[in-house]
UniProtKB/Swiss-Prot annotation:
Positions bound to FMN: K66, Q88, Q123, S124, W168, R178
Entry's family note: Belongs to the pyridoxamine 5'-phosphate oxidase family.
Oxidoreductase keyword on record: yes
Role this protein plays: Catalyzes the oxidation of either pyridoxine 5'-phosphate (PNP) or pyridoxamine 5'-phosphate (PMP) into pyridoxal 5'-phosphate (PLP).
Family annotation (InterPro entries): Pyridox_Oxase (IPR000659), Pyridox_Oxase_CS (IPR019740), Pyridox_Oxase_N (IPR011576), Pyridoxamine_oxidase_dimer_C (IPR019576), Split_barrel_FMN-bd (IPR012349)
Subunit structure: Homodimer.
Cofactor note: Binds 1 FMN per subunit.
Species whose genome carries this gene: Bdellovibrio bacteriovorus (strain ATCC 15356 / DSM 50701 / NCIMB 9529 / HD100)
Gene: pdxH
Pathway(s) annotated for this protein in UniProt: Cofactor metabolism; pyridoxal 5'-phosphate salvage; pyridoxal 5'-phosphate from pyridoxamine 5'-phosphate: step 1/1; Cofactor metabolism; pyridoxal 5'-phosphate salvage; pyridoxal 5'-phosphate from pyridoxine 5'-phosphate: step 1/1
Residue ranges of the TM segments: none
Catalyzed chemical reaction(s): pyridoxamine 5'-phosphate + O2 + H2O = pyridoxal 5'-phosphate + H2O2 + NH4(+); pyridoxine 5'-phosphate + O2 = pyridoxal 5'-phosphate + H2O2
Name of the protein described by the UniProt record: Pyridoxine/pyridoxamine 5'-phosphate oxidase
Enzyme Commission designation: 1.4.3.5
């Protein structure tokens, strides 16, 4: 039985550390589900980079499919799935852009080729051929030769402020444990169990 208390972030931290300790590959990889202006859903895998200021932070291109979806409808759903230890964590909340200073600080830690790629790629747009992207990478490598690569204005982070977090624990006979935290109007958390 999962020991539920008042702080879902403590539970998340404990379970993430457990997944890493058990060598779950890319334990910080999560699905991010968004919905566009027509109500069409889309999902992709991204990396959780930090948990801070009461939210879950990931990065990407603001002009990408996910960026446009979030601009239109900032309510998103995140999901971590660790089948080797029979656990999932589902997070529903509102995605907000983080500060430019936070995005700058993280961008500075990225590998140089990843920094160049953020300039070269028109993420989610149609491209004529793979060599087109290679040429753009070469162009930006030349442009920033011998310089620190600055963060592009169209690239940065989002922080998902959760309204609900579900911790799912797989059990035999599909009688799984589902422990729910829901945000209350006073900023606290209501906890309850949900039927599997």
């Amino acid at each position: 039985m999962f020991d539920i208390n008042k702080d879902p972030f403590e539970h998340f931290d404990r379970l993430m550390k457990e997944a890493v300790a058990k060598q779950i590959p890319e334990a910080n990889a999560m699905s991010v589900a968004t919905v566009d202006e027509k109500g069409v859903p889309s999902v992709r895998i991204v990396y959780l980079k930090e948990v801070s200021q009461g939210g879950f932070v990931f990065y990407g291109n603001y002009n990408s499919h996910k960026g446009k979806d979030i601009e239109t409808n900032p309510i998103v759903c995140l999901n971590f799935h660790w089948p080797a230890i029979w656990q999932q964590i589902r997070i529903t909340g509102k995605a907000e852009k983080i500060s430019a200073a936070e995005s700058d600080a993280y961008f500075a830690t990225r590998a140089r080729l990843s920094q160049i790629g953020a300039w070269a790629s028109h993420q989610s747009e149609t491209i004529p051929a793979l060599d087109w992207l290679s040429r753009r990478v070469q162009e930006y490598e030349k442009q920033f030769d011998g310089q620190v690569v600055p963060r592009p204005p169209h690239w940065g982070g989002w922080r998902v402020i959760p309204t609900e977090i579900e911790f799912w624990f797989g059990l035999g006979g599909r009688l799984h444990e589902r422990h729910i935290y829901q945000r209350t109007e006073d900023g606290g958390w209501k906890t309850f169990l949900r039927s599997p």
